[in-house]
């Protein structure tokens, strides 16, 4: 089974670059403080790296 990463949205997506908003949505994050556990895949890492300034990553 693949490793997982916990991702938390810590800043608002309001007024951000549209592609970065889509990355946050693609990770399954909906509101500030919302945490999800996603698989550690290159696709998810790419979305995390693109919107890193709005996220907290653990694991």
Curated annotation (Swiss-Prot):
Keywords: Ribonucleoprotein, Ribosomal protein
A Pfam match: Ribosomal_L30
The UniProt record lists the keyword Ligase: no
Superkingdom to which the source organism belongs: Bacteria
Disulfide bridge positions per record: none
CDD domains, alphabetized: Ribosomal_L30 (cd01658)
GO terms, biological process: translation
Family: Belongs to the universal ribosomal protein uL30 family.
Protein's name in the database: Large ribosomal subunit protein uL30
Organism (species): Stutzerimonas stutzeri (strain A1501)
């Amino acid at each position: 089974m693949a490793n997982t990463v916990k991702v938390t949205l810590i800043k608002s997506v309001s007024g951000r670059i549209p592609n970065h908003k889509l990355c946050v949505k693609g990770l399954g994050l909906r509101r500030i403080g919302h945490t999800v556990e996603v698989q550690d895949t290159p696709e998810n890492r790419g979305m995390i790296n693109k919107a890193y300034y709005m996220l907290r990553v653990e694991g």
